[in-house]
Swiss-Prot record:
CDD domains: ALDH_F9_TMBADH (cd07090). PANTHER family: ALDEHYDE DEHYDROGENASE-RELATED. The active site is at K162, E252, C286, E464. SUPFAM superfamilies: ALDH-like. It comes from Pseudomonas syringae pv. syringae (strain B728a). The record marks E248 as: Seems to be a necessary countercharge to the potassium cations. It catalyses: betaine aldehyde + NAD(+) + H2O = glycine betaine + NADH + 2 H(+). The keyword Cell membrane does not apply. K(+) 2 binds at L246, K457, G460. Pfam families: Aldedh. NAD(+) binds at G150, A151, W152, K176, P177, S178, E179, G230, T231, D232, T233, G254, C286, E387. This is Betaine aldehyde dehydrogenase.
Length: 490
């Protein structure tokens, strides 16, 4: 029997039954428990959500900027009041350690909403003089109804990253969470309504990407799709969005990011950064620095420092505050990660630690994979080329700066990159050469609300967060005013 009641769709300010009779299960990956049955939206539900969003968006956009800002700030306050409750639910649904969800996921999501709530009154047009008798003014108008499609690794945070700028700009949003982790997004919808966001301005449709995601992407009256997920799926979403009605898109996709340790680096700091870049959130972070480049002369010393730190990982029940490493998000994903680990062994990478499923005690019922470190890796190996999205670090040796920059850029992805060095000149020189949209020097992973994030190459299109993302949820209308005579050639 499920722990929670049947989860319905959230449309037009409240829960409604789906037109589709099918449901799917939300599973706790720490122990296999069925948390809830969730209704699967039908195609008619997508249309119902669009109609509600169109109605609500007109009301929302007609409010003054200050009114919209106040309502969004109320939502921030409610999020913070319910931080622990939301974090507990997120941990059950994702398997993420409560130490992450309680102190990072909800907190940083609320920070992003607060950031955009403060920017609402700053959405302004321009006045452009042409001549004494004429000028142009511009208006930044909302797009209308937009859609967000989320990934399973940061459910409520991603929903906030997408909805905050969209709502701040006066749009309505239809959001489809990942089928794997849907629960907290439904709670976010409740919070928006409680804060005073008009009915229909934030709707949640649950179900598969293959069906519900496709119907959303193809709907002709949705003006934009913001998608977070894998590159292959992102390409399909982008193609569908374009072919259906030339929708605008934001794509935050996969990565295989390089972390370069230089020969002057503080190796203890470098090892700490590498651990965070590979094992935080059990390795399920799109920006992870999974290709760790280390000078050959320092590789053995660096490996020893990594092994020393792996021993400090506290794996176990993610509801335990002392744990910092939980299960993977699902048993299906666990099998995928184990398959990559097997390929690493087959292709000749040297296994330093891990390499298998964690077993015994609490681990037997959950989707736990041991923190895994491979070394003596080569650029052609599958574990070095493809995104694994799990706790698997690959260490690669190198000799020269030119070599490591070339190899770091030898990937179809370009989401993130980082370097560790004491040489500030080298730091800036190398960062400017790396083909990645998010870069860190002597750090890894922080993505503040003010910081635009997004990828180069096949890691994405557009940006999330920062002022520029707010503009991506508006369109510019140009208006010319003529005060003088008008001359016709006819």
């Amino acid at each position: 029997m499920a722990r929670f009641e049947l989860q319905k769709l959230y449309i037009d300010g409240g829960y409604v039954d789906a037109s589709n009779p099918e449901t799917f299960d939300a599973i706790n990956p720490a122990n296999g428990e069925v948390l809830a049955q969730i209704q699967r939206a039908g195609k008619d539900d997508v249309e119902r959500a669009v109609v509600a969003a169109e109605k609500g968006q007109k009301i929302w956009a007609a409010m003054t900027a200050v009114e919209r800002s106040r309502i969004l700030r109320r939502a921030v306050d409610i999020l913070r009041e319910r931080n622990d409750e939301l974090a507990a639910l997120e941990t059950l649904d994702t398997g993420k350690a409560i130490s992450e969800t309680r102190y990072v996921d909800i907190v940083t999501g609320a920070d992003v909403l607060e950031y955009y709530a403060g920017l609402v009154p700053a959405i302004e047009g321009e006045q452009i003089p042409l001549r004494d008798s004429s000028f142009v003014y511009t208006r930044r108008e909302p797009l209308g109804v937009v859609a967000g499609i989320g990934a399973w690794n940061y459910p409520i945070q991603i929903a906030l990253w997408k909805s905050a700028p969209a709502l701040a700009a006066g749009n309505a949003m239809i959001f489809k969470p990942s089928e794997v982790t849907s629960l907290t997004t439904l709670k976010l919808a409740e919070i928006y309504t409680e804060a005073g966001v008009p009915n229909g301005v934030f709707n949640v449709l649950t179900g598969s990407g293959r069906e519900v995601g496709t119907w959303i992407t193809e709907h002709p009256r949705i003006e934009k799709v913001s998608f977070t997920g894998g590159t292959d799926t992102g390409k399909k979403v982008m193609a569908s969005a374009s072919s259906s009605s030339l929708k605008e898109v934001t794509m935050e996709l996969g990565g295989k990011s390089p972390l370069i340790v230089f020969d002057d680096a503080d190796l203890d700091r470098a090892a700490d950064i590498a651990m965070m870049a590979n094992f935080y959130s059990s390795g399920q972070v799109c920006t992870n620095g999974t290709r760790v480049f280390v000078p050959n002369a320092l590789k053995a010393e660096f490996e020893a420092k990594i092994l020393e730190r792996v021993k400090r990982i506290r794996a176990g029940n993610p509801e335990d505050e002392n744990i910092n490493f939980g299960p993977l998000v699902s048993f299906e994903h666990m099998e995928s990660v184990l398959g990559y680990i097997a390929k690493g062994k087959e292709q000749g990478a040297r296994l330093l630690c891990g390499g298998d499923r964690l077993t015994g005690g609490v681990f037997d019922k959950g989707a736990f994979v041991a923190p895994t470190v491979f070394t003596d890796c080569t650029d052609e190996m599958t574990i070095v080329r493809e995104e694994i999205f799990g706790p698997v670090m690959s260490i690669l040796g190198y000799d020269t700066e030119d070599e490591v920059v070339r190899r770091a850029n030898d990937t179809d992805f370009g989401l993130a990159a980082g370097i560790v060095t004491r040489d500030l000149n080298r730091a800036h020189r190398v960062i400017h050469l790396l083909e990645a949209g998010i870069c860190w020097i002597n750090a890894w992973g922080e993505s503040a609300a003010q910081m635009p994030v997004g990828g180069y190459k096949q890691s994405g299109v557009g940006r999330e967060n920062g002022i520029s993302s707010l503009a991506q949820y508006t369109r510019i209308k140009s208006v010319q005013i003529e005060l003088g005579d008008y001359a016709s050639v006819f």
